Amino acid sequence: MSEEEVHDTSSEASEVFTNQPNAFVRGVRSIFGYRKTSLTLFVILTIVVTAGLSFYDNSLELTIELPTSQLEKEILESSWLDLQNIARYPHTYGSRANDQVHDYLEEIIQDMEYDNDGEKIMFESGKGVVSYYESNNLLVRVNGSDGTLPALLLSAHYDSVPSSFGVTDDGMGVASLLGVLRFVAHNQPRRTIIFNFNNNEEFGLFGAHAFVKHPWFKQVGYFLNLEGTGAGGKAVLFRGTDYGIVKNFGGVRYPYATSIFQQGFNNHVIHSETDYKVYKEAGLRGLDLAFYKPRDKYHTGEDNIRNVSPKSLWHMMSNAIDFVQMGVVDDSEEPAVYTTFLGYFFATPISALARVNLVLLVLFPVVSTPLLFVIVKYKKWKLRVTNFLGVPLAMGLAVAVGQVGNPMLVSSHPMMVVATTTSIVVLVYYVVLNGVDWVNTSSDQKLVTMIEVSFVYWVVLVYVTWSGGDHTGEFGVTVLFFVQASTSLLGLIGWTFTRVRGGDEPLLSGEEERYGTEDERDTEKPLVEHNYDWSLQYLLIVPVSSLVVYNSGWLVLEGVNKTVQESLASEHLIYWIVVVFSQFLVLPVVPFITKFNRYIVLGLSVVVVVGVLMSMAVHPFNQGSPMKLRFIERVGQNDMVEVYGRQGFVEDVLSDLPSVKQTQAKLECEALPDGLEVCKYKSGLTPGNLTVEVTTEPRAESYGLISGAITIAAPENRMCTVHFPPDRVKAVVVGKFGNNFKAIPDGFSREKGNYIYKDRNGISQLELYKLDWNKDYHVGFEWLPDIDDEGGMRVEVECFWGDMVPAYQEVVHYSPNWVTWANKERGLVGVVKHVDV
């Protein structure tokens, strides 16, 4: 080798060495270059941060602090003791324990201005159903310093269902009211506060209905209702009547809220109701604050003091204490959109969000369409129809195959079900989009996918905006569309500023300078790992979108996943929620999904295999997440115990009961609509001396209508129901009334101490609730005879008792630990009598 050659070689080596980037540049390239390893790092960090922030945001232990001031410490200690005393026994309206709770509360408030409400009301509580109710609410009034302000009503109910100790539903609400009462006794509020410790909420919201008829109701302008539909945890702002009152919730110390649950009520996804409904319909403005999970312990013996903590009680109580100190309320009565994150509260009127949505829906298509035209026409961005087939094809396939086989598993293992479904969805997108990427030679298929995902969000946002005020929980779609469409728009703008090289000059290569990440298979394009636009796109889209979807979706799923066992319709709804949740979890990362490395794909495949195997092998219920069965014993011509639940579970539970095996009682199971079944058996465990005697009184006829009356004698009883043939009875009266129904106006009326209700469309059921345990019911009615009978009518009377009965004690004691029990009717035992009038 000559000296010149040696010199040239050493010069080239020196030039290569000097052109090597330094360590910092190499580090930046290794992290932010569009490499599979870099993307894997970003994805893992996103999962960890999203799950961590969501866990912290929803954690009771990490976000709520116990009181430090001496007064608040004493208030919490006293209220916790109150809760222990209130929830010592089940205390349904039809039990002696209910009276004990009433007397306990009355003793606490006796030194204040209070009223032992004795309202008697009668109203139509359902289609063809009339209810008569004798109230014993306890009302307390604390006068405020500014008498010009409308009063604030604080409400909670002190009854439970017969199958539950009523700790969360609604002992925590009652104890919180007592805590607020002690606080305002030391700190006079600005506005007058009226406390309604109401009774018999569970079977018809009767205590709230009674308060609406009370003279103090006229003072009230606003309300805060405290409830519980789970067993402990954090108390969430369920719903609010309007933006003006909702925004005051931002002043509490530990706000926790989402209007997603409000939409659930509005769209009838959540079927249970609270006193909020009565107060809102009566014209008041206010909030519903409630515990919301887990619903499998709701109305069961697991709603007990062991499953809650003082910190849960303090969360509800402290927010109530802060809320009662609110000032002037805004006049805005629009529906509110609201949420919290990391203790920060956000609320806006639905109209403001609708205006933002409309701007976004119009702005992005108007701006992006011309840009796309310019890029395709003048910047030589080669697009085919196949470029746009990937996302819709993958989305359809993912919906078709993305369900776990065991339909009940989501009740006990929601995280596993979501992880499995999401992994399936990711793998489907990975396979389909890689196939599309292989077929197409288009550069920046990633940007095409971003535009497609933006269009999906655009369609959803159109639906949300068009749906109006009932869709206050879908505010997250606005965020998802904004970040996705903005990033897509930036990508299009980047393309418009690229230079196109090429032409007829022979010295030009004919190549094009392209914007965006290139395809590795095109060796003439810049190296993929030296493109950094992807990292900006990822950071703009994925972290925010993932957090919004995960936090909202998980909150919803935790609130409703237990309802999968309530009906087939609920099962379908829950799995629809899981599929939608999984789809929206995956959509933000879809533009980058083709760059997933083999370790991510392998990990997702393992999750799918494990999830599918678990769905086949794992029992869907366990001690921590039990199945709820409903119980009623009916005593009459055929004394039977009836147990209701999902098909395929009830018979196995009952067949192992000692009374069933010893008496060789035959289990009669019957399929019911909506995936339910009822199993009946004769129990040798009698409920004791429960008697119902029904006597008839002479009937009379006037203008073709027949009137008659019955007397119901049911010792130690508070609850009975009279069933009439459909559409025949036109008027009912509680009390002793004459036969002149013709002069009575339609609807409710009261005459000579009698409570009368008239409905020409027909009354099929009369519910009776009284306070005197041994007083007889006197019921009169007027009916229209059938043409083919002699004017007689058969009436069914059923009276309920809420105290423990031997057959119920047996099923609780001997059933598997993956079963919990709730009442089917207003009592645990019902005595049925028939009488011909």
UniProtKB/Swiss-Prot annotation:
Keywords: Glycoprotein, Hydrolase, Membrane, Metal-binding, Metalloprotease, Protease, Transmembrane, Transmembrane helix, Vacuole, Zinc. Its main location: membrane. The keyword Phosphoprotein does not apply. The record marks 298 as: Transition state stabilizer. Residues 58-355, 406-415, 468-474, 561-572, 620-837 are vacuolar. It is found in: Vacuole membrane. Its cofactor is Zn(2+). Binds 2 Zn(2+) ions per subunit. Signal peptide: none annotated. GO terms for molecular function: metal ion binding; metalloexopeptidase activity. Its EC number is 3.4.-.-. The active site is at 201 (proton acceptor). One of its GO terms (cellular component) is vacuolar membrane. Zn(2+) 1 binds at residues 157, 169, 227. Residues 1-36, 377-384, 437-446, 496-539, 594-598 are cytoplasmic. It is a multi-pass membrane protein. Zn(2+) 2 binds at residues 169, 202, 299. The chain crosses the membrane at residues 37-57, 356-376, 385-405, 416-436, 447-467, 475-495, 540-560, 573-593, 599-619. Belongs to the peptidase M28 family. May be involved in vacuolar sorting and osmoregulation. This is Vacuolar membrane protease. It comes from Candida albicans (strain SC5314 / ATCC MYA-2876).
